[in-house]
Amino acid sequence: MYLYYKSKRNSNLKVTASEAILKGLAPDGGLFVPEKLPVLGKSMEELKDLNYQDTAYEVMKCFLTDFTEEELRNCIEKAYDSKFDDEAIAPLVKVEDTYYLELFHGATIAFKDMALSILPHLMTTSAKKNQVKNEIVILTATSGDTGKAAMAGFADVEGTRIIVFYPKNGVSKVQELQMRTQKGANVDVVAIHGNFDNAQSGVKQMFEDQELAKELADKGYQFSSANSINIGRLVPQVAYYVYAYTKLLANGEIKDGEKINVVVPTGNFGNILAAYYAKNLGVPIAKLICASNDNKVLYDFFQTGTYDKNREFVLTTSPSMDILISSNLERLIYLICGEDSEKTKELMEELKTTGKYTITPEMKEKLADFAAGYSTEEETAESIHDTYQKTGYVMDTHTAVAAHVCGQYRAKSGDQTKCVIASTASPYKFVKSVMSAIDAENANADEFNLLPKLQEVSGVPMPQAIKDILDAKVLHDLECDADKMKDTVKGILGV
């Protein structure tokens, strides 16, 4: 039986999974959500001996019901292969009494590889299924990691083109160089003069621009998205939470049915939403702990029920979380207001016009599955330093935010449930911040000179992704003002 997807702002608009992947965003600007959240047909015990690829198949077939087994397995095989430097794909590492789900073993050393390795294959399969003749233009805003992972995934994929926008001063040097050296005849990257929220809003506006869509169609193009607003990004992320639980079970760390807590460093709310979907699938997750940095708009939302983006935007050492408009929260809002598309639309309009909204007490009660915390810049650095001193384990800044919040939550609540932390990036990606936290003397060193030092202290070999950029040629130098994004896209495409 097919699982259909509908726009959260208009329940009458129903599409198949492959159509939702192609569209990215519904024509009314709403995000696609499953008509009903699926349940896994198998127990955790039955899945515990499966490898990552087979686990991903069991999870994704529940959501992508119009894909045949052959189509889905083919996408999975092409995605999760030797591009990953660990055959477990997402290894679970125990450090003291906490488990780190390392999601950074892919081609661009960030968790975005977990979904963006497969999205191009899901997209091209969807295009064939729906007899799409237009070239698909992937339009993406990035706070650092999505951009490179999407460019690497879509580079030279037939029938596609990708244009990435990133905030000029809002990414690390390594992240910027990763993007600006990306090869591929169908790849463009643009630095905007503004922050990530400007980039994301600009991309959304282009998706909703019907006149632009017509101009593109006349030239044989159509837009889609590689951001987590696309369900083709979100669904593959559900798989690794299922995999984490089954590995704990297989390793004898937990008993079947024993609940775990999951801590996720959160910016755009996609990664933690995937964990929420995993819980609904049947994974015994007790608490979903949302970890924020100094841009703590989500922490405040979970505390008060008011989402308010009217605040100073802080540039932190965990830039992938420097976000004040968390797009995927809209999907959760839709669920907690009883799938009321009118109410969801009303709240999103309020956010657009006033920059804030407040949920009802009844809706807030439905957030009991979540806990939230935040980590200041000092606490994040301490988290890296102390974990390294005690255990020798080196983590990146985003993972450190989650580790701090995990400790904070345990201390406040007394909850000793076993915790899995989503470890979202390699420390090599944020080498300056990581090495400065380990030893303050590194604060004035050149970022690239610190790479061999990190290898020395961590004992983890320098990833290929880093070696590749050290002597790579810069191929992209486009820049634009935030209000000129549409003109830039038209210029690139010759529209």
Map each language-model feature to its residues.
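PLP-dependent amino-acid enzyme catalytic core
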Residues: 1-495
